[in-house]
Swiss-Prot record:
UniProt cross-references to Gene3D superfamilies, sorted A to Z: Mur ligase, C-terminal domain, Mur-like, catalytic domain, NAD(P)-binding Rossmann-like Domain
Protein name: UDP-N-acetylmuramoylalanine--D-glutamate ligase
Listed GO biological process terms: cell division; cell wall organization; peptidoglycan biosynthetic process; regulation of cell shape
Superkingdom: Bacteria
Catalytic activity reported: UDP-N-acetyl-alpha-D-muramoyl-L-alanine + D-glutamate + ATP = UDP-N-acetyl-alpha-D-muramoyl-L-alanyl-D-glutamate + ADP + phosphate + H(+)
Job description of the protein: Cell wall formation. Catalyzes the addition of glutamate to the nucleotide precursor UDP-N-acetylmuramoyl-L-alanine (UMA).
Length: 455
């Protein structure tokens, strides 16, 4: 990493939220910045003018050439694959390539609690942040959610704490990143269109711990085989959590109680049925949050209060409204089959499920088995509609409706739902075939449902 960015030539690839934040930050550090994107993203009025006024040169609709004479450093946004030509050219030329997470870490003075995993990252990151805030700590919550870390890290000092949601894409370009506490919630199939194999995907998640030492902590899910297996390569102190079995040390559930035992001191945190979050998967998220909080020295009575008050975050099993006796649940963040399975398992009522979108190389067979077990009707849409319907039929599930668009999907679900049912949006797919983000998808779902409620 460059030690001084004054007059250094930096190419930032990817003009999304992360790329914009990196560009603004490096210009303030005296760098000459070119922000490039293969597409031409839509920005709010005045955004491009503000960037150019700040000194950022824009290259939208294509990438500039990369050579040692024109570029000293390449910063890749997490959404951009490392196989794009400017990155490959930089590697060939020996030009350093990094990402926003690594860059932010370079300027960080605060201890970091970093959370990764296939599912549950945002909920767990937000919960840990609330635990620290309630304990009186000055806390930044960011990374893959909220503000990019690079935009905020210099405002926080050694006595503060940073809680970061970290994706596999961000970890790909992390070389010296060293969180005080690293959390891996689970590793199930996702993003295989980018990582290729589960082995590659797990290895990328393991980069979380590559630079940790004996004074750091690795929080791992004992119930998830791939996550638990990461212990073999960890040099820091491992804290396991489990909702299925009792542990000699770590955080687990015993007799309906959340129990923590670190350094030989066992204590009850709270009852598991006191949690403000629905679903067994959210119990796992809470156990991980307890483990991270205990690693940072938070007292149990303080964190127990937060566990009771915390009601979750938007687009994750978010209750929207009850219309004509039917409850509508927004789980737009259920962007892979495992997340949608966990959503289906969270409810005992009859479910009308809305699923479909852009496939990320997923296998829908296990998801289809859960659909047969839990759903009364499946409404499919988007690029993956046929694949999901085919998988469901292979399991003997025939009550399938096809929707041409998102609004039609919600209206079809409403038509077949009866009082006491749940209409659940948990797509098991990404949103990019129809929306810019899962947030946009979830917001439209809420808008449609609330319009139905108004009549």
């Amino acid at each position: 990493m460059l030690k001084d960015f004054t007059r250094k030539k930096v190419l930032v690839i990817g003009a999304g939220r992360s790329g914009l934040a990196v560009s603004r930050f490096l210009v303030k550090k005296g760098a000459s910045v070119v922000l490039a994107d293969a597409g031409k993203p839509d920005y709010p009025d005045g955004e491009l003018e503000d960037l150019t006024a700040a000194g950022v040169e824009l290259s939208l609709g294509g990438y500039p050439g990369v050579g040692k004479e024109s570029v000293d450093l390449v910063v890749v946004s997490p959404g951009v694959p490392l196989t794009v030509e400017p990155v490959r050219a930089a590697v060939r030329e020996g030009i350093p390539v990094t990402g926003e997470l690594e860059l932010a870490y370079y300027f960080t003075r605060s201890p970091i609690v970093a959370v990764t995993g296939t599912n549950g990252k945002t909920t767990t990151t937000t919960l840990i942040g609330e635990i620290f805030k309630d304990a009186g700590m000055n806390t930044l919550v960011g990374g893959n959610i909220g503000s990019p870390l690079i935009a905020e890290v210099e405002r926080y000092g050694p006595d503060d704490v940073i809680v970061a949601e970290v994706s596999s894409f961000q970890l790909e370009t992390a070389s010296t990143f060293r969180p005080k506490v690293g959390v891996v919630l689970n590793i199930t199939p996702d993003h295989l269109d980018r990582h290729g194999t589960m082995g590659n995907y797990a290895a990328t998640k393991a980069r979380m711990f590559a630079n940790q030492g004996p004074g750091d902590f690795a929080v791992l899910n004992c119930d998830d085989p791939l996550a638990a297996s990461l212990k073999a390569g960890v040099r820091s102190r491992v804290i396991f959590f489990s909702r299925r079995k009792e542990l000699k040390e770590g955080v687990w559930v015993s007799g309906g109680m959340i129990v923590a035992s670190l350094n030989g001191h066992r204590e009850v945190v709270c009852r598991s049925d006191e949690l403000g979050l629905p679903g067994a998967h959210n119990l796992e998220n809470a156990l991980a949050a307890v483990a991270a909080a205990k690693a940072m020295g938070i007292e149990s009575n303080s964190l127990a209060g937060t566990l009771r008050r915390f009601k979750g975050v938007a687009h994750r099993l978010e209750f929207v409204a009850e219309v004509d006796g039917v409850r509508y649940i927004n789980d737009s963040k259920g962007t892979n089959p495992d997340a949608a399975i966990k959503a289906l398992e969270s409810y005992g009522e009859p479910i009308v499920l809305i699923a479909g979108g852009k496939n990320k190389g997923s296998d829908f067979r296990e998801f289809a088995r859960k659909v047969k077990e839990k759903a009364k009707v499946l409404v499919v849409l988007g690029q993956s509609a046929g694949l999901i319907a085919e998988a469901a039929r292979a399991e003997g599930f025939e009550n399938i409706l096809y929707a041409d668009g998102f609004r039609e999907a919600v209206l079809l679900a409403r038509r077949v739902a009866r009082p006491g049912d749940i209409v659940l949006l948990s797509p098991a797919c990404a949103s990019w075939d129809m929306f810019k983000s899962f947030e946009e998808r979830g917001d439209l779902f809420k808008e449609i449902v609330l319009s139905l409620k108004k009549g």
